[in-house]
């Protein structure tokens, strides 16, 4: 578990999940797939040589199978590997709505970003978590602590990861990110692990800065100048619409609407002469999914001691008990010329017209 915790994000490229969504998607993979390739490839020898834990030496002949670590870092199955039962019950501690990863990044990112996400009683959640015959289980006495934690995750998501300025930067980066990485990496990371390992935020920003300062290649120079504009926060997209809804009133199917679908429906509701205007959209349920608690698909297993019974709850169902608002849809444009037409179209698409 210590090794899996240490290496669970080893497959991340520069700019984390943005890299997944705007480069790795080309091959239908994500950082977990790359991480597994690293763990079972270049790192396998190092993992296999470990002979002790912080508490004691391993028994004679006892070693860590790198496949155990690779299995734990992702919810998808590891091809050709049948996990022993003891390993399968450990995975939810690293992958799930109240995983160790989630309980680590919420207070950490809240502190670093200067955003008060509210109290998070991690110790109570840990105290009342146990392994039952059904897997990782949370005693109902910790239910309120879990609600606080999920609410803090949602608050942090909207105030930091899905903040309007963050998303404006993301929209602008999306235009230059893929061609930049193609020049620096040159293909599928699984086929270029050596290059992938040295590709970091620092190396990327250093390279594009050099391009902007006078590359002989026109494409590199243009990309470098575009990156320089982002770094200087010369942002071209402006937020002109944001649709909110209460968690308990999320429209049926809203969480499955993609950016492309929302944009297409908006164009259908615009006057014919405006259907080709430039705008960008954001859908909270589809963007930054790794940090979005609304997109959790795993059930949480609760134990009810008075009834000696178990019940399963989806995260979204738990949110519907909380008085929280969610920003689901946004529209960005380079200016406000067609602001009222876009707002009218958005209200019609979302069924908010009065």
Regions found by a protein language model. Give the residues of each.
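Active-site alpha-helix of zinc metalloproteases
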Residues: 1-5
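Histidine-centered, transition-metal-coordinating active-site segments
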Residues: 10-354
């Amino acid at each position: 578990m210590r090794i899996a915790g240490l290496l669970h994000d080893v497959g991340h490229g520069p700019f984390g999940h943005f890299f997944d969504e705007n480069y790795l998607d080309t091959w239908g993979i994500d950082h977990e797939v790359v991480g597994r390739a690293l763990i079972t490839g270049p790192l396998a020898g190092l993992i296999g040589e470990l002979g002790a834990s912080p508490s004691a030496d391993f028994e004679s002949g006892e070693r860590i199978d790198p496949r155990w670590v690779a299995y734990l870092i992702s919810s998808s199955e590891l091809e050709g590997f049948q996990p022993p039962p003891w390993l399968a019950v450990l995975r939810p501690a690293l992958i799930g709505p109240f995983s160790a990863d989630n309980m680590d990044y919420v207070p950490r990112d809240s502190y670093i970003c200067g955003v008060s996400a509210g109290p998070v009683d991690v110790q109570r959640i840990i105290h009342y978590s146990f392994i039952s015959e059904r897997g990782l289980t949370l005693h109902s006495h910790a239910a309120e602590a879990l609600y606080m934690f999920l609410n803090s995750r949602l608050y942090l998501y909207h105030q930091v990861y899905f903040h309007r300025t963050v998303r404006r930067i993301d929209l602008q980066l999306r235009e230059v990110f893929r061609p930049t990485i193609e020049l620096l990496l040159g293909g599928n990371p699984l086929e270029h692990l050596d290059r992938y390992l040295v590709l970091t935020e620092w190396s990327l920003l250093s390279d594009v800065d050099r391009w902007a300062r006078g590359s002989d290649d026109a494409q590199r120079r243009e990309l470098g100048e575009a990156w320089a504009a982002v770094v200087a926060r010369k942002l071209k997209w402006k937020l002109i619409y944001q649709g909110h809804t209460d968690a308990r009133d999320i429209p049926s199917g809203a969480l499955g609407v993609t950016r492309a679908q929302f944009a297409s429906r908006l164009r259908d509701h615009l006057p014919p002469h405006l259907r080709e205007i430039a705008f960008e959209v954001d859908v909270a349920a589809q963007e930054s999914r790794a940090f979005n608690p609304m997109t959790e698909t795993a059930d949480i297993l609760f134990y009810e001691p008075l009834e000696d019974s178990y019940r399963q709850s989806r995260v979204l169902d738990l949110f519907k008990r909380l008085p929280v608002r969610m920003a689901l849809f946004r529209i960005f444009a380079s200016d406000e010329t067609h602001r009222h037409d876009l707002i009218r179209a958005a209200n019609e698409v979302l069924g908010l017209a009065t």
